[in-house]
Amino acid sequence: YGDHRDLHSFPTRRSSDLVSFDARAGEILCIAGIDGNGQTEFIHALTGLDKNNGGTVTLCGKDISHASIRRRGECMSHIPEDRHKHGLVLDFTLEQNLVLQRYKEPEFEKGGFIKKDAVRAYAERLIEEYDIRSGQGPVTTARSMSGGNQQKAIIAREVDRNKPLIVAVQPTRGLDVGAIENVHKELVKQRDAGKAVLLVSLELDEVMSLSDRILVMYEGEIVGEFDPKQITVQELGLYMAGAKRADKKEGETA
């Protein structure tokens, strides 16, 4: 990955214009905007949850515009907005959820059978490393865990996959202060390790404190690109609300 710059562009459902940008290694790029302005459609097109109806999505130097979710996952980790719908299988155990995307790998499967001891050892390592608290350890059902620990489990699973791009969508929604701090620390740690982190957030404080670069989305379009050190919270809020816009010249990447 290194200095490679990836371009992700596609038309959102709210606009005929293209959303075009690059996510760089070693930075947290934040897509900021008020809920309902195309962020969900954008993420679904990027991650493969919805079909990409036009434009291109390039990742790790490959066009993945029409690739399956599994193929996209070869270069991308995804911390989804809805941890219950897209992040966990609530009636599965914690250890089953932690290997959801990896159970076919030789480490965990042989001859069509799951290596239960390997899965257990892997889950116990992640539980310890990421301080995932659950009443019965690896065999705890995901449904019975607190929201903060459910989110820790998702982050542990996605980060441990060690992919060059981490897509984190509203990763602190519904969490308490302590859990929010843990999520923020992990995203910064991954940025510092050279990963590209794409953060989608509605929270102004979160956007300003974590981002190296900010793109504001309004009605399905990128209406401004900012350095968080050079814009105030108040001004950023105006862009997010559509009261201001910093239009790019035609053909310029936003």
Q: For each of these PLM feature ranges, what is it?
A:
Residues 1-4, 8-15:
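Short, small-residue-biased leader/transition segments that mark boundaries at the very start
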Residues 13-254:
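Glycine-rich phosphate-binding loops of nucleotide-dependent enzymes
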